[in-house]
A protein has these predicted regions:
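Conserved, well-structured core segments that form or line functional sites
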Residues: 121, 127-142
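Short, compositionally biased
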Residues: 108-120
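A short glycine-rich, His/Asp/Glu-containing loop-to-beta-strand
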Residues: 14-73, 122
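Short, Gly/Pro- and small/polar-rich lid/capping loops
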Residues: 1-12
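A short beta-strand-loop-beta hairpin characteristic of the jelly-roll/cupin
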Residues: 55, 69-91, 104-107
């Protein structure tokens, strides 16, 4: 039988940009040594958004040396990055972004979801790349 290493309690919800009300399941600063290679896991939602013409989400920001895996349960997310990657994912879809040597990206509610509004729910996991792969070319799969 394995011994329980720790119990992690949530630090509460916070907003990432103006479109993602998240609760950090774990983060690098909390339990990095115990969770390697996982850096962070954020759970967004469930939240209801009214229809809007505004772009809700998080604008351009840099990443380097890790990958993000995003799964949408309700709603839709559109991604665009400086390597030319991008796309829109909806319920049941997965997006995998490799930041590698570095990129700038943005994520917003998809235009379709913004127009209709409704329930939004997703999860995002950040995975540290091994040292020998940190300078790999950026990439996107969605």
């Amino acid at each position: 039988m394995k011994k329980l290493a720790f119990i992690k309690r949530s630090n509460g919800k916070h907003w990432v940009g103006d479109g993602f009300p998240v609760r950090s399941i774990f983060s690098y600063s909390d339990i990095a040594a115990e969770m390697s290679p996982f850096l962070l896991m954020d759970y967004a939602g469930p939240a209801d958004f009214p229809p809007t013409e505004r772009k809700l989400g998080v604008g351009q920001h840099p990443h380097r040396g890790f990958e993000t895996v995003t799964i949408v349960y309700h709603g839709g997310v559109s991604h665009r990055d400086s390597s030319g990657g991008g796309g829109t994912i909806g319920p049941g879809d997965v997006q995998w972004m490799t930041a590698g040597s570095g990129l700038i990206h943005e994520e917003y509610h998809s235009p379709e979801f913004a127009r209709t509004g409704g329930a939004f729910e997703m999860i995002q996991l950040w995975i540290n790349l091994p040292a020998k792969h940190k300078m790999t070319a950026p990439g996107y799969q969605g």
